[in-house]
């Protein structure tokens, strides 16, 4: 009997990607986060679609429409909080996924890695424009502050900002276009994710040892489908605990105050997942310098394959590099904490030191440590 799974043009693609895909036999739970990101994206698109059915992108009614969703729409409150906290889950999975790539040297798959960095930028852009939509105080002022950073670009900066705003300030035109961007970008992310997978399946997955695993492959289904389902269950457990018990734990109280252009909140800050980049931005007193540092903090990931000086791919057998990696993680957590603090002593100094350390570890210390390890192993 002909197996339709292996002959049908569409089924064949699914089969080669999720069923008969040869996968390394030793990949750990750190490899679960790719599939979790896919689930997060599907969840965000579905909850977002239902929210968009009731949302109005007008400055006069946006805040009221979000209130209406929570109060009057059947299960609107759970859809809204699943969407808001789903974004947090998305970024937790993203950061772990990128961290896994750094630790195990997955960045040597150049095309996959570069598309991953583009995906990271796109997801960050989507989250930013989405944060503006409820039109609370933090939405309005966050949009004003972050879009204003583009005015630091020499010569065209001011015109560029006014072009993005659609006027001389963040207003109705800005909200409408941000809603349009927020609707289209997830589908662009989905398309990019498919390209990401396409390039990954050209080379096959990396594994914790960083050694080619062609001699020892197992089919993706049932082994890793079961493993992924376990990860998905944990994801939903964590998400629904957050949604049902502490839906506003990760949010800012100012988003429950309607936007008021005449009243600036005491502390303008983005959602928690942008705080590390915000801290780097604030640690440089110059506007253009801050913007460049902000962009560089993410763009630096593109340099990772070229900064790899070790003879080994993974950090699994490199204890000094491992220590440095965890110092980098601690540094990013410090930056996240600093980003949420007011701009005053000692937070300014801590932020500046943490920002310098971030770039120092990636650009200097990691390549140097790898070279030292090579020499110690007489390679």
Curated annotation (Swiss-Prot):
Membrane topology type: Multi-pass membrane protein
Transmembrane intervals: 33-53, 77-98, 113-133, 178-198, 226-246, 288-308, 320-340, 347-367
Listed Gene3D superfamilies: Cytochrome Bc1 Complex, Chain C
Binding site for heme b b566: 97, 196
Tagged with keyword Transmembrane helix: yes
GO molecular function, one term: metal ion binding
Name under which the protein is recorded: Cytochrome b
Source organism per UniProt: Dama dama
Highest classification ranks of the organism: Eukaryota, Metazoa, Chordata, Craniata, Vertebrata
Gene: MT-CYB
């Amino acid at each position: 009997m002909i197996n339709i799974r292996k002959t049908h043009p569409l089924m064949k693609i699914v089969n080669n990607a999720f069923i008969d895909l040869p996968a390394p036999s030793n990949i750990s739970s750190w490899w679960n986060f790719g599939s979790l990101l896919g689930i997060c994206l599907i969840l965000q698109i579905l909850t977002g679609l239902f929210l968009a059915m009731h949302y109005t992108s007008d400055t006069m009614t946006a805040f009221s429409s979000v209130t209406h969703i929570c109060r009057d729409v059947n299960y609107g409150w759970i859809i809204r909080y699943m969407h808001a906290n789903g974004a947090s889950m998305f970024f937790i999975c993203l950061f772990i996924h990128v961290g896994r790539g750094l630790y195990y040297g997955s960045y040597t798959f150049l095309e996959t890695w570069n598309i991953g960095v583009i995906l990271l930028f796109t997801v960050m852009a989507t989250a930013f424009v989405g944060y503006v939509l409820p039109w609370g105080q933090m939405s309005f002022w966050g949009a004003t502050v972050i879009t204003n950073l583009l005015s630091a670009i020499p010569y065209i900066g001011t015109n560029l900002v006014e072009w993005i705003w659609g006027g001389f300030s963040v207003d109705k035109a800005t909200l409408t276009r941000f809603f349009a961007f927020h609707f289209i970008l997830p589908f662009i992310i989905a398309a990019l994710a498919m390209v990401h997978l396409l390039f990954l399946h050209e080379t096959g997955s990396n594994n914790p040892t960083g050694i080619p695993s062609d001699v020892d492959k197992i089919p993706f289904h049932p082994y890793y489908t079961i493993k992924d389902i376990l990860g998905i269950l944990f994801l939903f457990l964590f998400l629904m605990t957050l949604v049902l018990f502490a839906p506003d734990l990760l949010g800012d109280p100012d988003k429950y105050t309607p936007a008021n252009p005449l009243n600036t909140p005491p502390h303008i800050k983005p959602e928690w997942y942008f705080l590390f980049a915000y801290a780097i931005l604030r640690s440089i007193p110059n506007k253009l310098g801050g913007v460049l540092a902000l962009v560089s903090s993410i763009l630096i990931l593109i340099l990772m394959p070229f900064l790899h000086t070790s003879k080994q791919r993974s950090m699994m057998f490199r204890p000094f590099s491992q220590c440095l990696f965890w110092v980098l993680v601690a540094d990013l957590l410090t930056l996240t904490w600093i980003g949420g603090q007011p701009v005053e002593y000692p937070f300014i100094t801590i932020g500046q030191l943490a920002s310098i350390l971030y770039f120092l570890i990636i650009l200097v210390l990691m390549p140097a440590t790898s070279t030292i390890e090579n020499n110690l192993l007489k390679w």
